[in-house]
Amino acid sequence: MKKIASVLALFVALLFGLLACSKGSSSGASGKLKVVTTNSILADITKNIAGDKIELHSIVPVGKDPHEYEPLPEDVKKTSQADLIFYNGINLETGGNAWFTKLVKNANKVENKDYFAVSEGVDVIYLEGQNQAGKEDPHAWLNLENGILYAKNIAKQLIAKDPKNKDFYEKNLAAYTEKLSKLDQKAKQAFKNIPEDKKMIVTSEGCFKYFSKAYGVPSAYIWEINTEEEGTPEQIKTLVEKLRQTKVPALFVESSVDERPMKTVAKDTNIPIYAKIFTDSIAKEGEKGDSYYSMMKWNLDKIAEGLSQ
């Protein structure tokens, strides 16, 4: 019944969006490109490149999980009107309930013409769990080098759709990627100084594989990806037994997940939760971590601090 209601809501909202489209051109009265991103991280990267040259709508709200989402009528309307749509790809919005696949199909949008995966060119890491083996791990942005790649892919499509602002986009891209690159180099140096027997990042979801590869910090987790069961007794037991064989000084919990399973791990191992960190979303505006750059800086700083205890 819930699924039927969701489909009906999507259909009605799409009709409303198409009717709204018929009242004007897709670029709107402002003449600016209408751009849609699937989540707050992609929205922030896009804003850093496009500035005020576009009208931007981000679908999944700040703090919400982009793996499985039910688009609202406004999301359907904005998607149907969009000149350009950016999504992460590699099993994020297209895994789980495949909400993005349904959304663009119903909006009659065409891949690599209307919507683009910003992860194109990423060296993909694959999941390993019993029910997930062989599927792509979507969390590529947690390696800053991939964040730079995302920015370049976004700029490429903005320029293709809006060539008159090419110089503006390229200038912003250069400044932004230089900023990200400096943070990346700083992080690589910081993690070199942590003793090997303390060097492990422990989180609820196993979303730090790209981070681990980039910064040389092994990872452990309760569950592998948010589209599977989360925080079962067996998952918790497995992690607790693993941690008892280590000298890991700190645990971390993501801002967009239920923290109760990690609290159980902390209690059973006597290892404290050092900080909340960001994975699938930036923070609310005005809070620490409210941009891609600041969320990554927060993560890198807090993880290095916690593992240095």
Curated annotation (Swiss-Prot):
Pfam families: ZnuA (PF01297). Disulfide bonds: none annotated. GO terms for cellular component: plasma membrane. Keywords: Cell membrane, Lipoprotein, Manganese, Membrane, Metal-binding, Palmitate, Signal, Transport. It comes from the Bacteria. Residues 1-20 form the signal peptide. Part of an ATP-binding cassette (ABC) transport system involved in metal import. Binds a metal with high affinity and specificity and delivers it to the membrane permease for translocation into the cytoplasm. Also acts as an adhesin which is involved on adherence to extracellular matrix. It is an important factor in pathogenesis and infection. May contribute to the formation and accumulation of dental plaque. Belongs to the bacterial solute-binding protein 9 family. Lipoprotein receptor antigen (Lrai) subfamily. This is Metal ABC transporter substrate-binding lipoprotein FimA. The gene is fimA.
